[in-house]
């Protein structure tokens, strides 16, 4: 295969995968970010139902992360599995236009998340396979920045739609949400077009793998298994962001203000993703992740204690900083801890643990909100983040 010229100093695969994620996130943020408000304000769904929809879709679909990552290792092909995932997500979204109860909405959201479950591990492995270790943090940082930049643009577009269709009305209106769905379909289809420029990279396999098949495939390292355990602990307190959105509304912020907050969150996330990756290349992945988790613990404590609408703005900004520091760097850490021929499996397990844990996390959060008070889920999340952070310091030396 002829070597292609770098784009913006990056392997073309990294660039085009970033562009695909950019467009996909514009679409997803337009359609799904304000979905909890549509469920609550228009359909009258309870927080338990909202938590169930968010949790079961993410968790069940995340089982596919493990399978798709393992299968991409066995097949030796990442691109086609990833494309199938993007296609399923994009082609399920038009059905939101005819969904009138929470049941069909859950089914559509499930299909979207199944697509994400199929594509995420092979896509992350594609990024890792296309880059050298010394610049891998930058590559993952760029990908997360593009992903999050798309989310910011999608939310900005959502804020514009909300402003012109319903103004500063506190509750989300049905016609507003319908326009969000229609606009979200355009970038979803563009993403599928740009995916054709992604190529399957050549991977260097160990002798054991190239000659012995699955039985002699290298075992996943102990440090990676510890990382999975820590991610389970952290994610158990990191419920769906739907609860952060509901908390913002609970404190008196209207739909337009919430949309603008989410734009700010994603801009901060995008702004710090690439620098965080570069810093992790120099100072170590673990150190950057620990700082990110510490910020998360403080942010969730702030959501628990906050009584004023304006404080939510500050908390969402720091929540974006946490994501910028921890998300892409966490993926780079996974690729550092495992051999190249097992990366698909490793990313599948990593994303699978995070996604599967979202179901109990969201159900616990919904129950705490409804049975105790709206602050309780955030105290719980903050406490578990501190425990996970201590575990990272003690057990992940690299």
Tell what function each PLM region has:
Residues 1-11, 200-230:
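Juxtamembrane intracellular "pre-TM" segments in multi-pass secondary transporters
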Residues 4-62, 224-261:
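Helix-loop boundary and gating motifs at the non-cytosolic
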Residues 37-42, 153-175, 360-376:
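Transmembrane alpha-helix termini and helix-breaking/packing motifs in multi-pass membrane transporters
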Residues 80-95, 185, 287-302, 382:
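Structural signature of the two symmetry-related core transmembrane helices
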Residues 108-149, 333:
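Cytoplasmic helix-loop-helix junction between adjacent transmembrane helices
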């Amino acid at each position: 295969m002829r070597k292609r010229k770098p784009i913006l100093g990056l392997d073309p695969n990294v660039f085009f995968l970033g562009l695909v994620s950019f467009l996909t996130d514009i679409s997803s943020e337009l359609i799904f970010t304000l979905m909890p408000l549509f469920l609550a304000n228009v359909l009258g769904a309870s927080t338990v139902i909202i938590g169930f929809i968010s949790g079961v879709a993410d968790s069940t679909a995340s089982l596919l992360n493990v399978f798709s990552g393992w299968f991409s290792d066995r097949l030796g092909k990442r691109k086609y599995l990833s494309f199938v995932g993007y296609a399923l997500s994009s082609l399920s979204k038009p059905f939101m236009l005819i969904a009138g109860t929470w049941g069909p909405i859950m089914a559509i959201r499930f299909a979207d998340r199944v697509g994400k479950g199929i594509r995420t591990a092979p896509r992350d492995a594609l990024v890792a396979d296309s880059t050298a270790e010394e610049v891998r943090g930058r590559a993952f940082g760029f990908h997360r920045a593009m992903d999050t930049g798309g989310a910011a643009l999608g939310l900005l577009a959502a804020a514009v739609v909300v402003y012109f269709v319903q103004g500063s009305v506190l509750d989300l209106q049905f016609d507003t949400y319908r326009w969000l769905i229609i606009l979200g379909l355009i970038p979803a289809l563009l993403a599928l077009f740009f995916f054709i420029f992604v190529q399957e990279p050549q991977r260097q396999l160990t002798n054991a793998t190239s000659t012995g098949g699955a039985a002699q495939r290298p075992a996943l390292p102990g440090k990676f298994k510890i990382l999975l355990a820590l991610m389970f602990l952290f994610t158990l307190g990191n419920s769906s962001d739907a609860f952060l959105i509901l908390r913002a509304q609970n404190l008196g912020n209207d739909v337009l203000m919430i949309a603008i907050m989410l734009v700010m969150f994603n801009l901060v996330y995008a702004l710090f993703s690439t620098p965080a990756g570069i810093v992790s290349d120099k100072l170590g992945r673990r150190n950057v992740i620990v700082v990110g988790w510490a910020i998360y613990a403080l942010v969730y404590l702030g959501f628990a204690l906050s009584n004023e609408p304006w404080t939510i703005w500050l908390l969402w900004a720091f929540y974006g900083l946490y994501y910028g520091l921890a998300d892409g760097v966490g993926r780079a850490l996974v690729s550092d801890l495992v051999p190249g021929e097992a990366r698909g499996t490793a990313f599948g397990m990593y994303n699978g643990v995070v996604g599967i844990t979202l179901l109990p996390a969201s159900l616990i959060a919904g129950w705490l909100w409804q049975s105790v008070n709206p602050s309780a889920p955030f105290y719980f999340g903050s406490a578990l983040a501190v425990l996970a952070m201590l575990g990272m310091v003690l057990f992940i030396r690299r």
